[in-house]
Amino acid sequence: MKKRVQIILIAAFAAISANLFGQTTTANSTKSSYRPLQLSLVPYIGTNGIESASTSNYTSINLIGGISNNVGAAEIAGVLNIVKNDVRGFQASGVANLTKGFVGGFQTSGILNTSNTLLGLQLSGVANLNKKEANGNQIAGVVCLSKSIKGTQISGVYNYADSSDGCQLSGIANFSRKATGLQAASVVNIADTISGVQVAGIVNKARLARGVQVGIVNIADSCTGVSVGIVNIIKSGYHQLEFSGDELFYTNLAYRSGLKKLHSIVSAGIRPDYNDKTAWSIGFGVGSSKSLSPNLLLDMEMSYAQIVINDRFKDDNKLFKIYVGVDRYLFRGVSVALGLSANAMIYSTSNDFNRKQMENLIPYTITSDKLNEHKHISGWIGGKIAIRFN
C-alpha cells in the first residue's frame, strides 16, 4: 500500500510539473530567462518539467538530481547536478556536478566536478576536470585536471595542467608542460619547462629548469638554476667519474653530477687489507668548482661518510670532511685533481673492538676529545689525489 502511494505521488508531481510549468515556447526557452527557483526529484521531474534543460534558475534544489540551462546563485543536489551552460555562485552535490560551461564561484561534490572554464574553487572527493582555463583552486582526493591554471592544484594522487602558474601539490605526481611557481610531490614532478621550484621525494624531470630542483634524482636537459639531490643528471651539465686515494682509503670511487657551481657527490671507498679486516665507507657530499683558467678549476667540497669495519653496521662512525683542491685538465675527458682536507671523525667507543679499530685507522690527530661516554671525536688534516673522467 505504501509503495503504491509513493508511485501515485511521483506520477502526480510529474503531471503537475509538465502541465503547469512546461508551457513556455521554444523561443522563450532559447532566451533562458532566469526563474527564481527550481525543485526537482530527478532530471525533468520537477517544477520546470520537460523544459528543465532549457530553463535557467537562480536557485535549484534537487532531491536526487536536476538539470538546468544556467544557474545564477546556488544549486544543491543529493546526487547529481547537470548544467548545460554556466554556474555563477554555489554548486554542491553528493556525487557529481556536471557543468559544461563557465563556473564562477564554488563547486563541491563527493566524487566529480566538471567545467569548461573556472573562476573560483573546485573541491571534490575524487576528481576535478576543467577543460580550458582555471583561475583559482582545484582540490581533489585523487586527481585534478585543467588545460591551464592560475592558482593551486592539490590532489592525493595526480595533478595535470598544460600550463600552470602558481602551485601544484600532489601525493604522487605532478605534470605540466609549462610550470611557473611550485611543483611539490612525494614521488615525481614532470615539466617541459619549470620556472620556479620542483620538490619531489624521488624524481624531478624537466627539459629546461629555471630555478631549483630538490629531489633524490633530478633530471634536466638544461638547468639555469641549481639542482640539489643525490644524483643530478643535467644533459648540458657536469658529470665526472672519479677514482681517488686518500690517507684513510686508498681506493675510492665517486660520481659527481649537476652543475659546476653546485653538484652532488656520491662516493664509496674500501681498504681490504686493514689489520686483516675490511674497512669501507659510503658517503655523500656537495661541491662547487670555479674556473681559474681554461684548464684549471678550483674545487670546494663538503662531505659526510659512514665508516664500517668488518661489516659491523651497529657501530656508528661518522667522517665529516671539507676539501679544497684543484682540477687540472689533461686531455679530452680526463683530468687530475689534488688537494687538502680538514677531517673530523666521530666514532663509537661503546665497545673496545670499534674503539681500537678507529684509533688505528686514523693516521694522526691534531685534536682528540671525548664527547660523552659513548662517543669520541678526532681531527686531522689529510689530502686526496684523483683522476677524473668527464
Give residue ranges: language-model regions.
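Predominantly the C-terminal beta-signal and adjacent terminal strand-loop region
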Residues: D221-C223, K260-K261, I322, D327-N390
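Repeated loop/turn-to-beta-strand initiation elements of outer-membrane beta-barrel proteins
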Residues: F102-V103, L118-L119, E133-N135, I149-K150, ...
